[in-house]
Amino acid sequence: WLASDEDREGEAISWHLCEVLGLDEEKTNRIVFHEITKQAILDAIKNPRHLDMNLVNAQQARRVLDRLVGFKLSPILWRKVKPALSAGRVQSVAVRLIVEREREIQKFQSVPYYRVTAIFALISDSGNATEVKAELDQRFNTHEEVEAFLEKCKDAKFMVESVTKKPLKRSPAPPFTTSTLQQEAARKLGFTVVQTMMIAQKLYESGRITYMRTDSVNLSTLCSNASKDEIIREYGKEYSQTRAYHTSSKGAQEAHEAIRPTYMNEPTIEGTAQEKRLYELIWKRTIASQMADAQLEKTTININIGNTSEKFVATGEVVSFDGFLKVYLESTDDEEHAEDSSHILPALKEGDELQRREILATEKYSLAPARYTEASLVKKLEDLGIGRPSTYAPTISTIQQRQYVVKGDKTGEERTFTIDSLKGIKITQKLKKEMAGSEKGKLLPTDIGIVVNDFLMENFPNIMNYNFTADVEKKFDDIAEGKTEWTNWMKDFDKGFEPEVKEVLEARNQHKAGERNLGNDPKTGKPVFVKIGRFGPVGQIGSAEDKDKPQFAQLP
């Protein structure tokens, strides 16, 4: 009986065991289960199968291709860039993403604009005042526009033009896949990708959760029913809504289940603090996925400015039924709307006249693209169809171990901005300071990472192409489904790859990547280079072809 994990790697392990132990593949039972529970194992034993050689071949193809690319590219890097470097089909593309994002940020020119907000008051017949906060429906690009607008507002009348109420619903996120668990554990718990997988592995091995390397959002009928019972018991029948989710990611294996607790009636477990926190996250996400939508009412109030075409807009949301929000709300990496907030609005009606309390025009700056976190890099790789659940954590770990990428903080720059205020008929301006561009826990390319990326992009553009890497994943899927013969495909790939390798190796007149000729030394007439050496950047006088050995000096 063979009972390794039910994925391509697990199938290959079973095949290797057959080979090593001399077992007959046709007579050896292969069983699979997604959770380590008595019932799951007994069910698996009742339903054995034989080895699936298509899955084995898909894993063999991945292993051979990755070694072929790594074994042929790495020695080139040793000769052309620096010893002890490595390249890989997925890791090099991941580094490319980080390098390109860094260059986007370096090129980015921040553009100022002005966001205008206002505080109004509605005065009741009894003299009580109710405040209303609103934002102008457009932004200004220059300070002159701000001044002109505030001048108009001095004598303007402000009246409620319309009040619109619209019902909204919010639906829960699907159960966890490997990538979404890694992303959410990073956002909510501060775990690294590798840390998340290590803890999840322990939870799986102790029978607490289902298999943690999966790209499926499916839940078994057993889990859906157990979740329904738990929701009705804990929250009431109106909170229950059985849902079936379908995986949208490229090449997903629908036969697998999402990551979920093995027993839905256990919201907490015994274990380490980290195990408890990750388990609770998985339990809440799974339960929420089978709960009713949250029902909200969104109110939008348009406020007319008597002497100009611009309008102020106030928005608010009221939750009429919390539904799944009672248990769980998915986090986001999006910082663009961090300032936006919805609040409960007072009861206003069309025609109500509002008193202006204060109008503020705050200088803002457009934001550069955010650097990748481990979580957002996993999401980007998944969106591009690059890698699989089993490869995300090793890829991110490898590029940091190779020192192509480091995880660190970026200190922002102090920036001055203006706030113009209109109170009564007086316009005043304040200058304030802020730290702009500060980032924590982001993935940053190192000098050697940039050099290696540029060398590979120049000499092996096909290997570094995002579409190529994603297309290879599709080809592995075809092999797993028996649509493609893997050895023939490997031969076809190598026919195109080998000439590229040969051409780069034979380009002897090329300077090493990352090496720059600064001219000649005035004393000796020998060329002066700066380059990346074994232990970092160095200066060099003379070349390896000279009779005398070159002179080196470490650079800071």
Ranges and model annotations:
Residues 158-183, 252-265, 355-359:
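Residues forming anionic-ligand binding surfaces in small-molecule and nucleic-acid pockets
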Residues 5, 184, 188-196:
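A conserved hydrophobic secondary-structure block that centers on an alpha-helix together
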Residues 74, 107, 193-194, 212-556:
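Basic, low-complexity terminal or inter-domain segments flanking catalytic cores
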Residues 1-167, 257-320, 476, 480, ...:
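Phosphate-backbone binding and catalysis cores of DNA-processing enzymes
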Residues 160-164, 171-185, 210-214, 368-380, ...:
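Short acidic, hydrophobic short linear motifs in intrinsically disordered regions
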